[in-house]
Amino acid sequence: MAAGMGSRYGGMKQIDPVGPCGQVIVDYSLYDARRAGFETVIFVIKHEIEEAFKAAIGDRVSKVMDVKYAFQQLDELPEGYTIPEGRVKPWGTCHAVLAAKPCIHGPFAVINADDYYGPEAFKVIYDYLSTHTDGESTTTVW
């Protein structure tokens, strides 16, 4: 999940370079995920950062993975739920997965774009998902 502005960080840490050649943290995860066998990535972002995110990450990633976008919007809630007065932030991980639901067509994994997991984590989850399915492709949601 790639969301948007980090309130404590003071910017969009998901697209700020950290590597020696300008890599962002999610570049390392995407590399590991692709090597493990994941072919599709769904970025869950806010509409406000769409252009900047695509320019910094999405356009480049689309050369090696199938890239889809889902947009987490505060007012898109399951029936019976309402937004509390004064709430301005998205709802978190479950809400992000709900926003990505139309793009998910099989087993999937969820990670945060600003965390590093390492290659073994992707291998383990891909191996599990690909052996416990009906042959559907696996997807990673960021």
Question: Which stretches of residues belong to each language-model region?
Answer:
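N-terminal glycine-rich phosphate-binding loop and ensuing alpha1 helix
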Residues: 1-58, 67, 72, 106, ...
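Short amphipathic helix/loop within the catalytic HATPase_c
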Residues: 61
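Conserved beta-loop-beta/alpha segment of the NTase-like Rossmann-fold superfamily
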Residues: 64-66, 72-142
